[in-house]
Amino acid sequence: MESNLHSGSRLARLQNDLQQYQQQTFADESSVGPTDSRQMPVWHCRGKFPHREYKPLQFITYRLYDSVPKKVIEAWKEELRITEMTLPNDPKVLQLRNRIDKYEDAGYGKCFLKDERIAFMVQENLLYFSGIRYNPLSWCIMPNHVHVLIDVKEGWTLSTIMHGWRSYTAHEANKILGRTGDFWMDEYFDRYIRDEKHMNDVINYIDNNPFKAGLIDEDHVWPWSSLGLQSARSGEMSN
């Protein structure tokens, strides 16, 4: 995961501001003992991707219903089952991650999240329960998928949080578009954060996703992201 944001001083400052908060959050959560019941993983499968309800830090990707061909999803399910217990830097895991990246950034499907009305609504929904159900540490709303890194609050499960995000935004997006039917894909990916290096890698991955996908150049920030929101707020304060 390359960091392309360090070339511009303004972008570097934005990223540093975010990382100070993110690293403090990781330090606070790391103080919880390993035998604390809040740290114990709980698995959910329901015939789809296995999901780990893990507190505190989770990296989540969820997608529009038509963003990935169905046959690819079926292949991912089997590979995820096989690789779930392997080390994250295992070549098989890295190859799978590269293939997933390819489909995420290829712009398959109708890409409803390109509509600024919908991207804005999805971001507002993400921030609505900030500090209540979770703390959003980093996020990026791409044309056909969303990446989020959150610190889950005690008493809340990932499945509850995901339902809250997707049910409301699907309903509102369909109203905006004047359509009915599926909006989000049922399956989603989640990974718990193992350590500070893993967290920083994930943050760099999220921050750089619009650049990698060719949506912006390296001197700009994607508006529907944690960096974009921070940039907008910095601009408001300087005016």
Could you say what each language-model-derived stretch is?
Residues 1-239:
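Short catalytic/metal-binding and nucleic-acid-binding patches
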